[in-house]
Amino acid sequence: MLLPKRTKYRKMQKGRSHGLSYRGNSVAFGEYGLMALEPSWISSRQIEAARRAITNYVKRGGKVWIRIFPDKPITRKPAETRMGGGKGSVDHWVAVVKPGRIMFELAGVREDIAHEALRRAAQKLPVKCKVIDREEQGTMATDQEVSSESE
């Protein structure tokens, strides 16, 4: 599972997720990408499950890039513990994902195999996703901004 080797601080505040992803919102390495359509936290276990789903479907062909990294620690206090006594210990790590973020990329396989592999990976993730090609990514950013402004 993915987690940072070392961090400056052990614990982090929750924060708020709003707006679109302006970084990592285009297919940079592969031919096909899996784009998040809504904001969420994605745990390292979910990232690993999605990665396994992709590699299992494409077998030995193709190359997979994971474009998100779980660098936010989530703390949890033990069960049946009274309030207070400080912040709990780190339980797991998550990646903060905003709408428009490319989470996985795939290259070296046919289009139908890539779409099915990324669709299977999307089923393992807690966000609505869309499979995009390198060619259609230019129009996606403008579509995303237009749809969010109308709501």
Curated annotation (Swiss-Prot):
Pfam families: Ribosomal_L16. One of its GO terms (cellular component) is cytosolic large ribosomal subunit. PROSITE patterns: RIBOSOMAL_L16_1, RIBOSOMAL_L16_2. The keyword Nucleotide-binding does not apply. Signal peptide: none annotated. The keyword Lipid biosynthesis does not apply. Part of the 50S ribosomal subunit. Belongs to the universal ribosomal protein uL16 family. This is Large ribosomal subunit protein uL16. It comes from Chloroflexus aggregans (strain MD-66 / DSM 9485).
